[in-house]
């Protein structure tokens, strides 16, 4: 059914495969606007097919309207395929870049917190550091909240990207790797084939 927020609006996550040509995003945004649906998050990028792009939307709106948006998107000529993955078993991530004030006194603590959260420091200046945070929304929100005490100068977030989990992945059920990571699997497969 999707998330229903405190304000009564519903939130759905949609993934669309669309033709990679000018005006497609504008047509899709217009469709959302006409139906009174807010695009809370949007990520667009090249897909595995050269002439197609993949879009991930997080749409917010009236529950009766937002629940049907995938059907309306599917009617657009440029949309090859659309899926509502709100209730599906998916892996999703978001990326944020956050510039935080970091004086000589506060810098060690800022870096310590970044390490605890497995956050990358991608730029260091005289009075600030820029962090790259990848994860779910809760992780990013938590890190930004923690950094507020030092002074958050700028935040830039991507939209959510999502992909259906693989069925019956090694070491777990429905795409969960368990203790065996992808690099371990590649190393083991390389040893078995003699290519490592």
Predicted regions and their residues:
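Long, contiguous binding/interaction regions
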Residues: 1-54, 58-196
């Amino acid at each position: 059914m999707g998330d229903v927020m405190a304000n009564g609006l519903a939130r759905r996550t949609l993934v669309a495969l669309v033709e990679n040509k000018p005006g497609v995003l504008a047509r899709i945004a217009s469709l959302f606007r006409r139906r009174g649906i807010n695009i809370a998050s949007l990520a667009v990028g090249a897909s595995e097919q050269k002439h197609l792009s993949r879009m991930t939307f997080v749409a917010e709106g009236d529950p009766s309207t937002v629940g049907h948006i995938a059907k309306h998107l599917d009617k657009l000529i440029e949309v090859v395929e659309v899926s509502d993955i709100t209730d599906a078993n998916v892996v999703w991530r978001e990326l944020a870049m956050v510039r935080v004030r970091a004086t000589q006194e506060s810098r060690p603590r800022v870096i310590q917190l970044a390490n605890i959260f497995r956050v990358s420091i991608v730029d260091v200046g005289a009075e600030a550091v820029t962090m790259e945070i990848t994860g779910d929304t809760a992780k990013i929100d938590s890190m930004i909240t923690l950094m507020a005490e030092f002074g958050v100068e700028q935040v830039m977030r991507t939209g959510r990207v999502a992909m259906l989990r693989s069925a019956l992945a090694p070491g777990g059920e429905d795409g969960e790797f368990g203790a065996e990571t992808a690099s371990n699997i590649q190393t083991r497969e390389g040893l078995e084939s003699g290519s490592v």
